[in-house]
A protein has these predicted regions:
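Extreme N-terminal starter segment of soluble prokaryotic enzymes
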Residues: 1-3
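Active-site metal-binding loops of divalent metal-dependent hydrolases
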Residues: 6-8, 243
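Conserved N-terminal subdomain of the carbohydrate kinase-like
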Residues: 10-23, 38-117, 121-137, 289-307
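Histidine-anchored nucleotide/phosphate-binding helix
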Residues: 28-38
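Short beta-strand scaffold segments in enzyme catalytic cores
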Residues: 34, 79-82, 215-218
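Conserved beta-alpha-beta core of the PfkB/ribokinase-like small-molecule kinase fold
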Residues: 112, 116-194
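Conserved phosphate-binding/catalytic region of the ribokinase-like
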Residues: 158-165, 190-307
Length: 307
């Protein structure tokens, strides 16, 4: 079972190809859980949602076959996302749910624990407490740890104090390119090996960096795996990294090696971005078919100074 911590959000999304009439369910932990279950695994999402969205949230998760441990709060979280033709986006806060305060007992039985916050809802003390209560593989998507609300309700990014020590608590840390640069000070599009080396030097056993149309990198035990993205039309890239994480964690739960896991994760993400919303179509058969088409290069990275 995969246990995912992170608040759901109800987003308004506008891209060059799609514009949602109503706010749609999303969120890092939610999207990862959906992908994990659609691939054939068992998942439970831990988060907080406002009374206004509670019934819809529970119905959606039940329909998808996902368990939940939900705390209610004053309002549900959500963003307004505007994408340009290059895939760049602006985030405006529509609502912010409260921080998660409860750790379900099932954390002790989980095979994988995923921390996927959207906006500061997994306090550092909560993460440390989770680590002491589980022997599961722990995976971090740091996106919500690096966001705060700035002027006019716009999201701004920052590097929090103590993030290096926190990341070292995890077995796998998966930032995207923006988050990688915030964490390391290195643009991974310009020097990918150096950016990964900085994160490795923090004591992270496996570093996964996603790079949108440039694919992804996995570095583990001194081995470097570079995955090309599959060609597709990105109708809505919201949740691409989330579902990449879901596919990766499912692959690991099945005992796949890093090469095979990265191929499957790449395939899962390629299916998500062709669609919009939590009802995205994803089957294990199609994901496996696409995974077989992923181009991978493998080598040991050259010695790279991390400073």
């Amino acid at each position: 079972m995969m246990l995912a911590f992170g608040n759901p959000v109800y987003d308004s999304i506008r891209t060059p190809w799609v514009w949602t009439r109503d706010r749609v369910l999303s969120g890092c932990a939610t999207n990862a859980g959906l992908a994990y279950v659609k691939m054939g695994g068992d998942a439970c999402v831990v988060g907080r949602v406002g009374i206004d969205r509670l019934d819809h949230y529970h119905r959606t998760l039940k329909s998808a076959g996902i368990g939940h441990h939900t705390e209610t709060c004053r309002e549900s979280g959500g963003f307004k996302l505007d994408y340009d033709h290059q895939g760049r986006r602006e985030l405006e806060v529509l609502g912010q749910a409260d921080a998660i305060t409860q750790i379900p007992d099932s954390v002790a039985r989980a095979r994988v624990v995923f921390i996927g916050p959207v906006l500061q809802e997994t306090p550092l003390d909560l993460i440390r407490a989770i680590r002491t209560r589980t022997n599961a593989t722990m995976v971090l998507d740091p996106q919500g740890l690096l966001r705060r609300v700035g002027a006019g309700g716009r999201i701004e990014h920052f590097k929090p104090d103590g993030i290096e020590e926190l990341c070292a608590l995890f077995d796998v840390v998966k930032p995207n390119e923006l988050e990688t640069e915030i964490l390391t000070g290195v643009d991974p599009r310009k020097d990918l090996d150096r950016a990964a080396a900085v994160l490795e030097d923090w004591g992270i056993p496996t570093v996964v960096i996603t790079l949108a149309e440039l694919g992804a990198l996995i570095v583990s035990e001194g081995q470097r795996y570079r995955f090309d993205a599959l060609p597709t039309l990105a109708v809505d890239s919201t949740g691409a990294g989330d579902t990449f994480a879901g596919g990766l964690m499912f692959a690991l739960s099945q005992g796949l090696n890093w090469r095979a896991a990265g191929c499957l994760a790449t395939a899962v993400a390629s299916m998500m971005i062709e669609q919009c919303g939590p009802e995205f179509e994803l089957t294990s058969r199609e994901a496996q078919r696409r995974a077989a088409r992923v181009t991978v290069s493998e080598r040991r990275p050259a010695a790279t100074a991390a400073t």
